[in-house]
């Protein structure tokens, strides 16, 4: 009796796995975790490239003087390479469908000050995600 239960339980698990894999997102993307920048500073650059085609987005981040733009440029190039190699998409039709920054853990450091005091320095991190799609 237990063997029949085990068999039916396996069928249910297989069905659940098949359903989960069918829903998987097939859009090319790239993620960077624990980037050493605050979410607010990363969003300045991400807001500028959201919805643009990839050539325009690359031009924007290349000539943007912010530190976040150099990190996002690498991430965008990685997403473009993923689209070409893994999905077989051409770069002419690609655009930035989603790009967002989520808050990561904050490293807390101490800066010594006068008369025995200490100030807390918060080194913020963020998780960056770029999702591309074809027009």
PLM regions with names:
Residues 13-101, 125-135:
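Ribosome large-subunit tunnel/peptidyl-transferase-proximal elements
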Residues 104-135:
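Strongly charged
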Residues 1-12:
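Single conserved hydrophobic/aromatic residue that forms the stacking wall/gate
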Residues 5, 49, 102, 114:
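Short glycine/serine/threonine-biased micro-segments
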